[in-house]
Amino acid sequence: MSASSPPTASDEDDSNSPPAIVDAPDAPPDERPIRYIIQNLERAYGVPENSRRSDPLDMLVQIILSQATSDTNSRRTFDALKQRFPTWDAALRARESTIAATIQSGGLANQKAAVIKSLLRQIKQERGALDLSFLHELPPAEASRYLSQFRGIGPKTIACTLLFACRTEVFPLDTHIFRILRRVGLIPQKCTDRRAHEIMNALVPAGKFYSFHVNLIRHGRALCRPRDPSCERCPVVEYCDYGQTLI
């Protein structure tokens, strides 16, 4: 994923999961290892910047469409959806089957169409307009609680929406980021989504949420792959529990 492309939440969200932003753990974390890791990832991959806010509802739908597909497919699917329905009110008036047919190329079309249709309907009923720009002004925990009420919207989708659209300092986790964080020892091997979000939202230094998220994705694709990771070339192997067992 490039720094300018929409984020992906490649895992299917669990609508019963807790909000993405929760109270921090009681014990203050040791920031030294994570600061080292962030610094060395930035030396290796650059310092990505999230320079501007974007429309939260657009972003939320993009994240829904990104689940279980590639960045390229999700962008293509979102573009097709916006071309077919220039406004979200037009999408709301459409049949769910028409939405599904429009996003078919992105996979899980029926499931995603149901989530999108339900989301739009509920926002319209509650707010009177299909507009989530008010999320820009809400405290992070309040924005997270609001988004968590929608069916099919879980912690990864919430965190990605708030980080990328609102520039909120919250840390999204997916399978790939979970893998790297477990390897370097920042989260336990057995760790729930809720606990992992607690740990990382408390641990990541202010101003580094976006950079760390994007660079972990880059690192996972370039070196820290699920199989045959290139530990000998890893810029953070010194602090990696897993890597130290292989070199």
Outline where the language-model segments fall.
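Short, contiguous pre-domain boundary segments
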Residues: 1-27
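Catalytic cores of DNA base-excision repair glycosylases
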Residues: 21-247
